[in-house]
Each structure stands twice: as C-alpha cells, then as structure tokens.
Amino acid sequence: MAGGALGAGVVGVGVGTIFAGIARDAFQAEPAVDDGPDELLREPARAPERRQVRSADGTRLNVEVYGTDAADSDDVVVMVHGWTCNTAYWYPQINALAERTTVVAYDQRGHGRSERGRARPTVAMLGQDLDAVLDAVVGDGRRAVLVGHSMGGMTIMSWAAQYADKVPTTVSGVALTSTAAKAVLQNHTLIPMNLPRYTRPFEATVGKLFTSAPVPIPKTPYGGRLSHYIALGPNARKAHVDFVDDMIGACPHRSRAGWGAAMGKLDVTAGLEALTVPTTVIVGSDDRLTPTSHAEQMAEVLRRNGHLRDLVIYDGVGHMSSIEAAERFNELLADILAEVGSEKVPA
C-alpha cells in the first residue's frame, strides 16, 4: 500500500511538473497580436448545400458543398479537417475559392454536425468515412483534389491504405497539411526542453492525458493563451487564436478523447506509400503538434516514390497553418488546381 502510494505520488509530481512547465511557457510568451478581425474567417456569405452522407457503419456525416455542384464544376476540392475542429476550420479557403471552385468540407465523425457513431474510434474509420463522402460528391469519371489538415491528413492516408485502387481514379492531387504518418504522440514539441530530468519518464503519460482524457475544457479568460502555445505560432494574430480556441472548446469532450486515443496507435505509412498522385506536404516551422520532422519524413517517402510535388515550410507558423498563413496557403491551392485540377479519369 505504502509503495503504491509512493509510486502514485512520484507520477503525480512528474506529470504535474510537466503541465506546470507548459503553462509557464504559455503564459510567459508574448500575447497574440490584436490587429483586428480577419475577413477570411467570416462565415461564408452564401450558405452551403448540406447533405447527410452515411458511412459504412451507418453513421451520418454532415457534408457541406460550397460553390457550383460538383458534377458541373471544373475543379472539386474535398477538405478534411483535423482533431477537435469542424468545417469552419476551412472558412479561409472556402471564402477564397468557392466562387470559382466547388469546395466540399465535412465534419469528421463526432465533430461539428456529424454523428459520433457507436463503435470505438479507429484510424481505419476515418478513411472509411472519407470514402463514403467521395462516393457521394465526386461524380463518375471525375477526380478531386484532397486537402487534409492534421487528423485530416491522416484520414487521407488511411483512405489510401484501404482503397489504394481508387487513388488514381478518384484523386488528381493531395495536400497533406500539418500532419503525420506515424508516431504522432511520440514526436511532438509541446513539452519544454528545460524541465528537470526526472520528468522524462512521464512525458508519454502527459501525451496520453493531453489527447485522451475525457474531460470538458472549461471556458476561462486564460484558455486562449494555452491554445496559442499549443496550436499556433509565436506571432499569431488574436483573431486566429480566438477562432481556434472557440472551435476547440466546441468539440464534445468524449469525441476529443476518443479520437485522441485512436491517434495514439497511428501508423498510416501504407497509405502514404499508396499516394500515387502529385502530393504536396505543408507544415509550419513552429508547429508543436506535428513538427517539421514529420513533414520531412513524409516528403522523403513521396520523393523516393516519385510523387512529391513539393515540401512547403511556412516560417513562424504553428499547427493551424491554413489559418495562420491563409493567403499563402490559398495561393498554393490555386497553383495545385491549375496544375492538376479535377481532371477526368485517364482513359
């Protein structure tokens, strides 16, 4: 009994020291730049066409189509958001692209307006959900450009691993943004490097608690400082920090925990190998959740296979790269569409 209590106490001290170090760095950092609202983050003026798409297990997914109908459009972009986000994550791209492009965004299961489903979340489910969406929105003989952020990039790779034969016939290009193919919880830079050495054995425990503890996130005046530290770059705009903090806070805690636990077993390298179309890898230099090492590893696999379009690193940008660097990101998407677009399936 005494030994167990002592062990628990040691763990508590180690874990507590790490969380205290994260909080210290978050609150000592420069506050976000308050330079007014970002018009790209506004809700799109034109309401989307909303569809309910059922995944393989019957879970209903909320799908939003902006712009012209996918069947009539020259370009179709399917956007897949990340962990704790929802379709609003893509507002900067929808607002910039939807007038001339069909933009499809959907809520991952358990996020936004999509059902959570009854089964325990798995990375394989993410790919199956994406397959159901693609079947519903990409017409026969058409191909789309897939854009995935964070868990959304993992979703694309999960889909490619399970449906490799569909990759060349369904997709003309891919953008993997601020994401990883494996070991995402083992390779991050959230924990300060200057903590006592005795905390090292408890870093994995902190990672699991951070991602998979099923507890609500209380709304406090200080939450934005933590969101800034965790998810955005050091010079982020306050409008971006507030937007991200509100979006994360809106994610149901059970979904956040379930998908956080699922990512603990992440390995979609088979899907990365199956991406046989031009693929762009994008990351911020200051991404703490999926550091540049992940992007470089993915880019090397794609380069070796002859399918790397480009590796793009945005200086000073954190994990929310397509919000923080929206103008540059939108220009990059426009370039990708100009090169590959939603081409017809090769004869």
Predicted regions span which residues?
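Short beta-strand/loop motif that positions the catalytic acidic residue
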Residues: 275, 281-283, 287
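Conserved alpha/beta-hydrolase catalytic His-Asp/Glu region
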Residues: 210-271
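Active-site loop/oxyanion-hole signature of alpha/beta-hydrolase fold enzymes
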Residues: 111-154, 163-167, 331
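Acidic catalytic loop of the alpha/beta-hydrolase fold
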Residues: 263, 286-290
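Catalytic histidine-centered segment of alpha/beta-hydrolase-like enzymes
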Residues: 289, 311-332
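Flexible "cap/lid" loop of the alpha/beta hydrolase fold
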Residues: 161, 165-212
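Alpha/beta-hydrolase fold catalytic core
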Residues: 1-76, 99-102, 139, 168, ...
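Conserved HGGG/HGGXW glycine-rich cap/lid loop of the alpha/beta-hydrolase fold
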Residues: 59-116, 123
